[in-house]
Amino acid sequence: MKGKLSIALMLSVCFSASATDSVHWGYEGNGDPAHWGKLSPDFSLCETGKNQSPINIRQALNAQHDPLQLAFQSGTQQIINNGHTIQVNVSPGNTLLLDNETFTLQQFHFHAPSENEIDGKQFPLEGHFVYKNADGALTVIALMFQEGAANPQLATAWQQIPARVDQAEDVRTPVAIQALLPTSLNYYRFSGSLTTPPCSEGIRWLVLDHPVTASAEQISQFSSVMHHANNRPIQPLNGRIIIH
């Protein structure tokens, strides 16, 4: 299992990076989000795309959509600071059933402050759980954190952040993914994109409407490791429908 996870890590260390290692991009200076679309032809959607993420979630349509069907399985994890985020890669076994398709969790990572907003409210931290189906299509479950009580699962992750950038470490005490999520799994749904280059579209976004808590110290610790904000600015909705 460890070998399989290591191979997966090498092939796709981060959907945030998305095979963009040869082109420097980031959140500051000439590599910041305003410049992404011009850094490489592969990044053109960052500038020209019409279904980009993140968005400000507002005026959502109330609709009957299926409850989240999640399954969790304990397994091995690896944690890495890739310079853009703190990411936890997970072994197979955690699944999402959506639109009669099975998606498998690949990794989860964080942005501070939040990328998506809900009715104009920005949260201090947002987690993205990246799922992939057999055809390679992606679904992202987004989880908001509000300042409050310390989060035990974040504490588990933060204690194991590697000292060096791009250094992957086996997680000695795995993060309990189910325990990281709220008890209520109501969500907003819309079509969007990766929030990092190459900004690929066609991503199914499910943004949970109930935040969980993280302490001010935990939020500050993440920001200190990143040394800068790592959120892409809000993108135009361009007539997209949001359902809730």
UniProtKB/Swiss-Prot annotation:
One of its GO terms (cellular component) is periplasmic space. Its main location: periplasm. InterPro entries: Alpha_CA_prokaryot-like, CA_dom, CA_dom_sf, Carbonic_anhydrase_a-class, Carbonic_anhydrase_a-class_CS. Zn(2+) binds at residues 109, 111, 128. It is an enzyme of class 4 (lyase). Residues 23-244 form the Alpha-carbonic anhydrase domain. Residues 1-19 form the signal peptide. It is found in: Periplasm. It holds the Pfam family Carb_anhydrase. Substrate binds at residues 195-196. PANTHER family: CARBONIC ANHYDRASE. Reversible hydration of carbon dioxide. This is Carbonic anhydrase. It comes from Pectobacterium carotovorum. The lineage of its organism: Bacteria, Pseudomonadati, Pseudomonadota, Gammaproteobacteria, Enterobacterales. The gene is cah.
